[in-house]
């Protein structure tokens, strides 16, 4: 989910305003609130149509929303609106295509009618990245399988990428057997990574 991937990034503070655009039944909103975030809001046209649709938030999540919008123009409009609401980043997830999923689906427009009679647009990783670039002229960064982030805050993006590289370096050093007998080097890199990532 977007919320799980978002929590893994450690991008925000407890005071960050997070808006779940198309929140469904509110599972991600609940998860973020249980994780200590105070300013989490959700809106969904079907389940929470009367909730306030925020006009500005630090972070906006868009979990599996693009998959269920049948009209291509409405799909693009939704993505653009969610992106415009975010001041720091938009985190979104999409269903990726797989043979298991598609074997029971009926082709319809640019997507499928699922086995439970709902519209689904499945994407390949290359297709969703091209779609985002065509609309926003920005390359999304992959957080997890089918989950991406589009930064609006360049400093935050650089901070995220730096911490990600430090984390990868720390994992490499911890796994590298040539450091087995060099406790000092391994411990030093590990402490440095912990300091940077905290």
Language-model regions: role of each:
Residues 1-55, 91-197:
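Class I (Rossmann-like) S-adenosyl-L-methionine-dependent methyltransferase catalytic domain
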Residues 44-46, 60-62, 79, 83:
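Conserved binding-pocket/active-site segment within a compact domain
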Residues 59-73:
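A short SAM/SAH-binding and catalytic strip from SAM-dependent methyltransferases
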Residues 54, 73-74:
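Short amphipathic alpha-helical segments
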């Amino acid at each position: 989910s977007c919320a799980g991937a978002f929590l893994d990034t450690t991008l925000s503070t407890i005071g960050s305003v997070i808006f779940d655009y198309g929140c469904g039944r509110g599972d991600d909103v609940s998860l973020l609130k249980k994780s200590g975030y105070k300013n989490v809001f959700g809106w969904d046209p079907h389940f929470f149509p009367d909730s306030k649709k925020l006009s500005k938030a630090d972070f906006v999540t868009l979990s599996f929303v693009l998959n269920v919008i049948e009209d291509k123009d409405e799909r693009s409009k939704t993505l653009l609106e969610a992106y415009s609401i975010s001041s720091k980043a938009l985190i979104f997830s999409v269903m990726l295509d797989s043979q298991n999923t598609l074997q029971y689906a009926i082709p319809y427009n640019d997507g499928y009618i699922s086995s439970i009679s709902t519209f689904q647009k499945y994407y390949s990783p290359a297709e969703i990245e091209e779609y985002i670039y065509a609309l926003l002229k920005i390359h999304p960064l992959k957080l997890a399988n089918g989950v991406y982030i589009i930064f609006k805050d360049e400093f935050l993006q650089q901070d995220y990428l730096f911490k990600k590289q430090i984390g990868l370096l720390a994992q490499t050093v911890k796994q590298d057997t040539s450091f087995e007998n060099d406790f000092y080097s391994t411990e030093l890199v590990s402490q440095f990574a912990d300091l940077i990532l905290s």
